[in-house]
Amino acid sequence: MSEKRVLRVAITGGAGRIAYSLIPLLLDGRVFGNETLIDLRLVDIPQADMRLQGVLMEIEDCNFSCMEKITTTTDTATGFQNVEVAILLGGTPRKQGMERKELIKLNAEGMAKQAKELEKHANQEVKILVVANPANTNCLAAMQAAPTLPKGNFTCLTRLDEERLRAIIFAEISKKLDKNAANINSSDIKGVTIWGNHSSTQLPTVHAATITIDGKVNKISDLCEASAFESIIEHVQRRGAALIGALGASSAMSAANAIMLHLRSWLADGQDEDAIFSMGIISDNNPYQESLNIPSGLVVSFPCRRVKGGLPGQVEIVDGMEVPEMLHPHLASTIAELKLEAKDLRGSEVVAESKL
């Protein structure tokens, strides 16, 4: 029997709601497999130290099969020491009356500090997933604050939006089909994509998506009414706000599930190299600069896939994906928002200090 490897993983916001849902997924092998043991570091602010201890007790009482070691700390130098994967959940939520520029500045400051600590203490090939909002621009701030870390090692989460899109598409298809007779489920839907910002301007697309029914590959666009696509876009764009309105808090369980899927697609062994998934990555030299006017210098959600024959963590933007002309204004809107956020980032004091 081969010896199990140990993977060092840090989570900021380690005492929070998303971390609480994510930890079991990491420690029972659902992300990196049963042959990988997790040396987990839960990092949070000093005010959350007591809650960290409570989370630690619960982890200990679960006896997870893939748990190697657990560290709880309020010191990033300790939490980030030699880590190979960093999941940045901790951020400042938007408060009533707060302008977007203020939110970007506050979070950019926090992300810059965390990124500098990762640059100083983490493994130099550390893979960084930014979840805290505004996720795309937070990821850009982190990336630029740690210039010695490869840009390709930074991503932000848009998989939650993709899963929301997959769910609503499945619901639409199920209205027309007997899903039990057809023996289908939502995981049979492939190629749905999120473009742009993780915000209400995002562009969900399904025009390259398919579903396999009874062994036959069908285009989603052939199974859904054309009139449904605009409402589907609006559903995904507004889903986060609707959830907050119903729950009184942002998503945690579904966010943790999306993080699991993101990390698995990006970093786990044995993944399908043809599978297309959405993630926010640096837009430098992207194949859509001319056709869709997506510039370099932003963190944008694209359709991505693993590099064929490459190592875990090596991904590429899928070229040739169709975005119908009628959706180009939607795409232009989300790119314009990202440009504005990047401009606000450049204008903040923390960016000037960090030479972002």
Task: Give the ranges of each region predicted by the language model.
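Rossmann-like NAD(P)(H) cofactor-binding subdomain of soluble oxidoreductases
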Residues: 99-168
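Residues forming the Rossmann-fold NAD(P)(H) cofactor-binding site
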Residues: 20
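N-terminal Rossmann NAD(P)H-binding glycine-rich loop of SDR-like oxidoreductase domains
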Residues: 11-15, 23
